[in-house]
Amino acid sequence: FADMISYKFTGPKRNSIIVFEEPIENKVLYTKRAMGLPGETVKIQDGILYINGEATNFRQYSNLGIGDNEWRIPKKGDKLEIIPAGNYNKAHSYTAIDIEKIQKELKYNSASVYEFMPNLKFVVNGEETGLILDFIHDKDVVAKLMVGETVEVTLDDDYYLALGDNTDNSFDSRYWGFVKGSRIRGRAIVRFWPLNRIGLVK
């Protein structure tokens, strides 16, 4: 079960378990912990999550999908640039582009964003950061990126770093990027699975 009311008035607090629509298929509900909040910097090094440069003691995380990079979590009003880098495959400019086919592929495999658009960079207020995959649902944005154009937008919402308790192998923000605030449906309050952990969420 989830409390669907709390976050209508205030954003999630750190370490709270949130229920949200992931940004790829745009319909699957996940439950993860909100570990990074809008405007903060996050980094995972030697299994430790750093927030604004300070080590946390919540739990150990692998840095798969992040590497040694420090990410700035976007917040409402930030300027986002999505930039196809220098070795972009210009062959796309001379062929018909099936945007719907590309969107479908990206929905099922977010990593393929780099197959279609090599070295795609996400830059917030001049700082390179992690994936922001909401754009794959906008045909106009995808079309511009496919011909090597930089897309610039002003973000209309806050974003969060969502991490799973299965810290070495969780399908979370380390793989599909930040979670937009409007995707969050509520706060998880009861756990039904696995069976040996049924009860109130803490």
Regions found by a protein language model. Name each.
Residues 1-202:
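Soluble "head" domains of membrane/secretory-pathway proteins
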